[in-house]
Amino acid sequence: GWHIECSAMSLKHLGERFDIHGGGSDLIFPHHEAEIFQSECCLGHDPVVQYWIHNGMVNVDGEKMSKSLGNFWTISEALENVDPLVLRYTLINAPYRQPVDFNQVMIDDSETHHGRLVTCYGEGLAKFGRGASMNKECDWRMFPELVDAANRFEEGMDDDFNTRVALVEVQAVVKMLRGLLDDMVDYNEVTDDGVYIGPISDFIAGLIGWLSEFAGEVLGLLPEEADILEAIHSEESAKDEISQDVERLL
């Protein structure tokens, strides 16, 4: 009965042809094959569905997630222990068709890499963001390295939504930005309002813009800019208070 139910619901709500049908890889046979057979015989044409997207299974510590094994997590339960953006990073760190082994080591690794992304982006935004937003010439498309990274990112996403390839490019751009931020005091000047200027400031602004577009808008891995800047301001204020306490003790 459930095969014909899905064919009937699809026809009622999506029409005789629709673009994408999703589902787990365990449903390919017999469920989805039965849907195809029923729908095409009923309607007299094919294909009814243009693209079938089958996701891999989620395993927990090497075992299939199931209620019978007692290792079943709902999204709500996972979010009680894992930041939503870290969870997203964890799940897209592998092509969606492949199984994902959901374990604490994987979550910790994702938390480290995601934290590096947000921290690096936030530092760059705080020091170069205002200049970058005002200077339209800082567009990342000016820089061949970033155009190449964007092309590789898009090629990965065009290859059946290979988000793992896309994340590799994000990590590479973060590494570039991190290196420049660590060394920027050597070849940049600071204005009275705290904005860095100098020979590489445009490139750093381009890196920030690239991350905003691809890590933020496309992959959805960045918090709101206001939240990032507020967190950085709070951290800097806390550091200042500690420094003042130390000075008083001395």
Regions found by a protein language model. Name each.
Residues K67-L250:
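Conserved nucleotide- and phosphate/pyrophosphate-binding catalytic cores
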Residues G1-K127:
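Alpha-helical recognition segments enriched in aromatics with Gly/Pro capping
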